[in-house]
Amino acid sequence: MATSSPPQAVTTLTESIKNLLESNFCHIVVKGELSNVSLQPSGHLYFGIKDSKSFLNGAFFHFKSKYFDRRPKDGDSVIIHGKLTVYAPRGQYQIVAHALVYAGEGDLLQKFEETKKRLAAEGYFSIEKKQPLPRIPKCIGVITSPTGAVIQDILRILSRRCYQYKVLIYPVTVQGATAAKEISQAIEVMNRDKLVDVLVIARGGGSIEDLWAFNEEIIVKAIDASTIPIISAVGHETDYTLCDFAADVRAPTPSAAGEIVCQSSQEQIQIFKSHLRYLNAHAQQLLAGKAKQIQQWKRYLDHVDFFRPPHQSLDYLRVSIERSIQTTLSQSKQRYRQYTRWLQSDILQRMTYRLQDLWKMINLAFQNRLLALKHHCVHIKKNLVIHNTQQYRQRFDPCRDQIHRALSQRLGYFQQSLAHKQTLLKHFTTKINQLFIKETSALNLLKKRLNKAFVYTVCERREHFLYAKENLFLSLNHLVERHRAKYHTVSQQLISLNPKNVLKRGYAMLFDFNENSAIISAKSLHKHSCVRVRLQDGEATLTVTDVQNFETQEF
């Protein structure tokens, strides 16, 4: 006979089936026809979806808050997104929906997704292109229908929240074949005239067909080209259009756009008060810190130096500290002088070498130029001698004058450069001397502060030493008294437990005559045996004549 599995409770089996369905069918899409549609006052929708052969129960929780613009009815062809689960009390599996699309809208949704992906790939929805909204706009542009409730809601919110504002309304058609073109033209006109600081594109809720104008590519491109920040307030919170993705900010509703575009006067006042409180607190904290620091410095400056004869260890400490200070100062001065000499010698040497090189280059260039001019003059002179024409003589004189002027100008430039270098060298030498004097003053000041701090530290250490010494003596006295009392108590206990003191009160001690051990029980005695008895003032030998054992006896 085959071994059967243990029986399961119905609840356990139902839970297992429920977990299996929910884990394997967590996201499904079902297409069919609605039947038995029931919308409860709580906002939950219960329905059945069927085709020609099968039927499936379903539920859509909080349906009314998400799809209040259209109520489904029996016979509607829909596409439902959801998951499978089990309703345990009846043991029925059902679909729990989280999105419902009417079958006629499926093609539009597919077109919406395709256009969205293409425009996103082209960079129209890039986060880097988003413009920040002005904190306090002076003029607000609204592109919407002038006759709808949307513009009234926006104006009501603005009048309640904003202190001073201007609204420029550009009337357009928000539904139909011409709506997309009118809206894009309105955006272009607003950007061309530069009359507003921020734009709001608004429309009330509706089906996907009603809102399709805001999914047109022409509007997305107009928003992308806009230099004015744009807020998209199209439809309800659950409605999404391509206009929302392209805009700089998306508002869930037109009323929310009125709250986003203009910060309320009370909020501005609260922010200002918050900043003012922060500045006051920060200033108070800063002043308190500076006052505390000044008081601390004042205590240091007002400290009266005094010296009392310290112990020998404190003298050694002072000598050691002074020696350490002198050594440190000496080493610092020596290193400073060494660095200064190194800097001075190195820089002066490099400057000297540089000037010498420049002077050599100048002389060499001058000599080369002069030699070249001499050769040129000799050549010209030969030509003059050979040809003996007045034309060469007339050309030679201006060239000679020009050459002399150029040489004089070049020589003057080099002399000015040399003078400038010498001035820089003197300035640098002066700076080094000033720095040396400044560092020497700082070292002397540091030495004075260290001496003053040393005196203060020595006095403070001496007071701490005396205080610790006094505490040590007090602690030792307390410890001695405590051990003395403990010794007295233990001595009294030893005296009270001494057997000899017990014998003084009339008691006696028995010892075995042969083994010389104490007898504590009558069972260890025998008739005619000998025992020794010890009294207060002596011992005696006794013979046992009779032995009686007692079971228990209380005194």
Swiss-Prot record:
Its EC number is 3.1.11.6. It is found in: Cytoplasm. Disulfide bonds: none annotated. It is an enzyme of class 3 (hydrolase). Its main location: cytoplasm. It catalyses: Exonucleolytic cleavage in either 5'- to 3'- or 3'- to 5'-direction to yield nucleoside 5'-phosphates. It comes from the Bacteria. Keywords: Cytoplasm, Exonuclease, Hydrolase, Nuclease. InterPro entries: Exonuc_VII_L, Exonuc_VII_lsu_C, OB-fold_nuc-bd_dom. Coiled coil: none annotated. One of its GO terms (cellular component) is cytoplasm. GO terms for biological process: DNA catabolic process. GO terms for molecular function: exodeoxyribonuclease VII activity; nucleic acid binding. Bidirectionally degrades single-stranded DNA into large acid-insoluble oligonucleotides, which are then degraded further into small acid-soluble oligonucleotides. Belongs to the XseA family. Heterooligomer composed of large and small subunits. This is Exodeoxyribonuclease 7 large subunit. The lineage of its organism: Bacteria, Pseudomonadati, Chlamydiota, Chlamydiia, Chlamydiales. The gene is xseA.
